Amino acid sequence: FLDSALLGLEYALLAVGVYITFRILNLPDLTVDGSFTFGMAVSTVLCAAAHPFAGLLAGALAGAAAGVVTGFLQTHCKIHPILAGILTMSGLYTVNITVLGGPNVSLLDAPKFFEVLGGKAPAVGLVTAVIVVLVTLFFQTVGGLCIRAAGSNEDMVRASSINTTAVRWAALALANALVALSGAILAQCQGFGDVGAGSGMIIIGLASVIIGEVICGRRGIVIGIV
């Protein structure tokens, strides 16, 4: 049971990222499988170089970059959101192999972030809780409200002289940063990074969102993210 709970915590930020795109922004984003592995690959390389905390941060930034690429394809290249996500995900497969330098990399002898924070469960729980609180607070700010409004009625937001392109980019960057951070955490907790680890992550994320809504219902942004 404890192992299952820990695995759930490791995937928690993945679910939050999927929730942001599919429920708040109302946009299908299939970049998830690629950005999850991208975050894992970057985290693995830096962790192997004895920089575990930098690996988490860089992994999240890598995911944000992947989200921006998807946003660019949608807004500037006028590609359908589903196809844009597939294109980014496919391109990231080659990038991930290049970053890792092979199909997988072991981290058995490398220092991990949770070793400094008192073990896997406390460390992952702390990081997840802090990120969830920060994301929840962000969606109460002007920027967060713009994303929520764009998901409800993009035409109205555009008529209010708000840059909907920037809003979409920001939402996709945030969502994929969280997804990639989940991959970065998982890599260090399981002790290796694998180029095929992202396969099926979008299904896991969507299933988490749907199960959460069945249990808690749609009771607003705070309950939704939690």
Per-segment meaning from a language model:
Residues 16, 56, 60, 64, ...:
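Hydrophobic positions within alpha-helical transmembrane segments of bacterial inner-membrane proteins
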Residues 1-51, 73-77, 210-219:
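Single transmembrane alpha-helix segments in multi-pass membrane proteins
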